[in-house]
């Protein structure tokens, strides 16, 4: 578990340095979510929850702020729940499951933003978040599946 948390911290730090689309703030690759995929499919939900809590709290203390922690906890919690439930659906593969996780991660964060600002204009951002969550979620899931099949970690 320590290795996963260390890798998650490194990935979180790298993501603070990389701006995926400069014109659109807040879109991230979600590198540490590849670790969530690996943990979910290899060790189960309990390890995922512990990993996410440790990574988010430590990352928020080191690289972020209270609001970032709220957004991350909401996104991680909802996406992990969705991925856990969809893992039981036989026709959804690892990249597809991760794609749904990415989408719901962004949806949860959108609702946190709405709760904070109390303005419906935040929902104009939904199409961008839907597309970016699907794209990055699928890519991260593909990486996770690649590692799982080859037992690289």
List where the protein language model places each region.
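Hydrophobic transmembrane alpha-helices
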Residues: 1-38
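Hydrophobic alpha-helical transmembrane segments
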Residues: 2-3, 34, 38, 46-53, ...
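Aromatic-anchored segments of alpha-helical transmembrane domains
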Residues: 5-14, 54-64, 104-108
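Short glycine-rich loop/turn motifs that provide flexible caps or phosphate-binding loops at active sites
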Residues: 7, 29-31, 43, 47, ...
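Membrane-embedded alpha-helical hairpins and interfacial helices in multi-pass inner-membrane proteins
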Residues: 25, 65-70, 85-153
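Generic transmembrane alpha-helix motif of multi-pass integral membrane proteins
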Residues: 31-45, 82-87
């Amino acid at each position: 578990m320590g290795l996963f948390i260390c890798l998650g911290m490194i990935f979180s730090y790298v993501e603070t340095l990389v701006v995926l689309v400069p014109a659109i703030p807040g879109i991230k690759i979600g590198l540490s979510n590849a670790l969530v995929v690996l943990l979910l499919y290899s060790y189960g939900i309990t390890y995922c929850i512990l990993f996410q809590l440790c990574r988010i709290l430590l990352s928020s203390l080191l690289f972020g702020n209270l609001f970032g922690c709220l957004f991350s906890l909401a996104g991680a919690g909802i996406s992990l729940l969705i991925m856990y439930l969809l893992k039981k659906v036989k026709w959804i593969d690892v990249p597809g499951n991760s794609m749904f996780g990415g989408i719901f991660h962004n949806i949860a964060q959108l609702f946190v933003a709405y709760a904070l600002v109390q303005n419906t204009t935040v929902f104009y951002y939904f199409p961008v978040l839907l597309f970016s969550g699907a794209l990055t979620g699928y890519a991260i899931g593909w990486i996770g599946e690649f590692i799982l099949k080859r037992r690289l970690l």
